[in-house]
Design a protein with these regions (language model features):
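A shared catalytic/ligand-binding motif for oxyanion handling
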Residues: 1-155
Length: 155
C-alpha cells in the first residue's frame, strides 16, 4: 500500500472522553504510540463536542455520535500520511463510521465499529451486509463488537 513504508493502526475502547484528564492522557498515549491511524470506540461525545478530539499532529478527525453521552466512534489520521478523503459515512447512533480515501494514490476504506450491547452479532452482520459493495481488499475493519468470547466472559 505505501511504497517503502508501512501503515500502523491502533484501536482503543476509551469508555468516554468527557473528562479533560482523560483527553490529555489519550493525547499523550497517541503521541507515544505514534501510529498512522487511530480508531476509538465509546467516545461518549455529543455531536457538538467533537472538537474535544483534537490531538497535535492529527488534523483529519472523523467522528460519529449521537446527542447523548453514549456510543460514539472516531477515526483519527496522522498528518504524517497523505490521506485524501473521498467519502465519509456515519451512523447517526454513533455505532460506526466509514472513511474512504487514498494514501499515495492507493484506495483505502477504514470502518470503525462499536456494536450495541444487545444484539451485537446481528447488528454487525446486518451492517457488514449493507456495506458489502463498499468492502474490498483495501478495507480495514476495526471494532469493539461487544461480544463475549465464552459464557464465562458474560459477567
Amino acid at each position: 500500500m505505501i511504497t517503502g513504508s508501512y501503515l500502523s493502526i491502533i484501536t482503543l475502547n476509551i469508555n468516554g472522553l468527557n473528562a479533560p484528564t482523560k483527553r490529555q492522557r489519550l493525547d499523550e498515549w497517541i503521541q507515544k504510540q505514534d501510529p498512522s491511524i487511530c480508531c476509538l470506540q465509546e467516545t461518549h461525545l455529543k455531536t457538538r463536542d467533537t472538537y474535544r478530539l483534537k490531538v497535535k499532529g492529527w488534523k483529519k478527525v472523523f467522528h460519529a455520535s449521537r446527542d447523548q453521552k453514549k456510543a460514539g466512534v472516531a477515526i483519527l489520521i496522522s498528518d504524517k500520511i497523505d490521506f485524501k478523503t473521498k467519502a465519509v459515512k456515519r451512523n447517526k447512533e454513533g455505532h460506526y463510521i466509514m472513511t474512504k480515501g487514498s494514501i499515495q494514490e492507493e484506495d483505502i476504506t477504514i470502518i470503525n465499529i462499536y456494536a450495541p450491547n444487545i444484539g451485537a452479532l446481528q447488528y454487525v452482520r446486518q451492517m457488514l451486509t449493507s456495506m458489502k459493495g463498499e468492502i474490498n481488499n483495501n478495507t480495514i475493519i476495526v471494532r469493539d463488537f461487544n461480544t463475549p468470547l465464552t459464557s464465562i466472559n458474560i459477567n
